[in-house]
Amino acid sequence: MKLTKTSRPTTPQPGLISTWLLRPLLLLLAIALLYQSWFLLHIIYWRTYHPTTSAFMQDRLETMHRQNPAAKLQHRWVDYEQISNHLKRAVIATEDARFMQHQGFDYKAIEVAWKKNLKQRKLAAGGSTISQQLAKNLFLSSEKTVWRKLQETLITLILEEFLSKRRILEIYLNVIEWGEGVFGIEAAARHYFGIPASSLAPEQSAWLASIISNPRFYDTHRQSPRLLKKARIILSRLPTAKIP
């Protein structure tokens, strides 16, 4: 009787398993680095050149086009020196009082916002700095996801590393929304007061800064008691606001 050899199941060698796991991880890492470099290159470019649009501007324009295909945004870039210092102080006073001190993240504001959210049991306050808001406006969608928040954090770090505080504030004032289809402080000053951004008085600046939180609503509710009260508070804080 002839004995036959029974074949034993082969087990993958440890080195082969490591290779199988390592390759997809390296590929994912390469894709992530390539994706981040896209943001980095844009930000380095904007050290010298002005952004002509933003992700948020494009999103708003698409929304407007669904209602009116001929709709256009009001937007005109204006250099830092041509923006009223009153307006700069007003925006910092209301949006990011420690703008000149932090490196992109105001941990005190985040703590206050977190406690407020816990008290109200909802996401009512965010504690985002001007740099964080700029990261969202320039590159990101309005989705509220963990991935988007992580991406916002990375972009904020890049902004703070490669742009000066002065440049961050200049771009911010030129790209944020100030009303229905109104983007940038020059368009806002002309839309609401019929004057250039360089001529904004303290009272006008405080009022404009107070509408940043909900610009489209306040575009049609300009005499809202809540808005006017907020503007008076901002006006009282102008002398202590520090600008680049």
UniProtKB/Swiss-Prot annotation:
Membrane-spanning segments:
25-45
So what does this thing catalyse?
[GlcNAc-(1->4)-Mur2Ac(oyl-L-Ala-gamma-D-Glu-L-Lys-D-Ala-D-Ala)](n)-di-trans,octa-cis-undecaprenyl diphosphate + beta-D-GlcNAc-(1->4)-Mur2Ac(oyl-L-Ala-gamma-D-Glu-L-Lys-D-Ala-D-Ala)-di-trans,octa-cis-undecaprenyl diphosphate = [GlcNAc-(1->4)-Mur2Ac(oyl-L-Ala-gamma-D-Glu-L-Lys-D-Ala-D-Ala)](n+1)-di-trans,octa-cis-undecaprenyl diphosphate + di-trans,octa-cis-undecaprenyl diphosphate + H(+)
Localization: Cell inner membrane
Question: Tell me, what is an example of a GO biological process annotation in this record?
Answer: peptidoglycan biosynthetic process
Question: What is its EC class?
Answer: transferase
* Assigned EC number: 2.4.99.28
Q: How does it sit in the membrane?
A: Single-pass membrane protein
- Has the keyword Kinase been applied to this entry? no
Family matches, as InterPro entries: Glyco_trans_51, Lysozyme-like_dom_sf, PBP_transglycosylase, Pep_trsgly
Its UniProt pathway annotation is: Cell wall biogenesis; peptidoglycan biosynthesis
Q: List the molecular function annotations (GO) for this entry.
A: pentosyltransferase activity; peptidoglycan glycosyltransferase activity
Q: Which Pfam families match?
A: Transgly (PF00912)
User: Which cellular component, as a GO term, is one annotated location?
Assistant: plasma membrane
Keyword list (alphabetical) reads:
Cell inner membrane, Cell membrane, Cell shape, Cell wall biogenesis/degradation, Glycosyltransferase, Membrane, Peptidoglycan synthesis, Transferase, Transmembrane, Transmembrane helix
Report the protein's function.
Peptidoglycan polymerase that catalyzes glycan chain elongation from lipid-linked precursors.
Question: Hey, which family's this protein in?
Answer: Belongs to the glycosyltransferase 51 family.
Q: What is the protein named?
A: Biosynthetic peptidoglycan transglycosylase
The record lists the organism as Nitrosomonas eutropha (strain DSM 101675 / C91 / Nm57)
> Corresponding gene?
mtgA
